[in-house]
Amino acid sequence: MTLQNVTVIIPAHNRPERLRRLLDYYSRTDIKVLVPDSSDHPFADAEKYPDITYLHRPKLHFLLKLKEVLPMISTPYVLYCADDDFAVPSGIAQMTAFLDEHPDYSTAQGHYLTFTPHKGKISFYP
């Protein structure tokens, strides 16, 4: 499965451990990744992800971060993903296939699953 037709935007702000986890995840795919980061300090591991475009813009407002990266998108599809979410590649592929097959649609959204760890157990709910 190829996802070269997708760019994911991951706006980040002062949660480097979550950003690292998500970049580790997406670095195993061929999805293009843009990270506008308004954190106080630059993400220390940014250089470990050479295929990911990382922009450190301290204290930049959320909408201005998006405005800066939108012109960088060169793919037909864009996915917004917060740094504490995961969009799984199979779901992304299903959404792009749906949009390819239904040109009268401009957006698609998958299912969300939330989990909460508590006392050694994990609860899942939609």
Where are these regions (language model features)?
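Cell-envelope/extracellular polymer assembly enzymes that use nucleotide-activated donors
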Residues: N5-T7, K32
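Short, well-formed alpha-helical segments that are part of the catalytic scaffolds
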Residues: P11-R28
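Short alpha-helix within the catalytic core of nucleotide-sugar-dependent glycosyltransferases
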Residues: L23-D24, T75, V88-D100
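Acidic donor-binding segment of Leloir-type glycosyltransferases
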Residues: D24-H56
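Glycine-rich, basic loop-to-helix element that forms the pyrophosphate-binding segment
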Residues: R57-I73
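Short aromatic/hydrophobic "clamp" motif used to bind/position activated sugar donors
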Residues: V78
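The conserved acidic donor/metal-binding loop of glycosyltransferases
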Residues: A82-F86
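Conserved donor NDP-sugar-binding/catalytic core segment of glycosyltransferases
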Residues: I92-F124
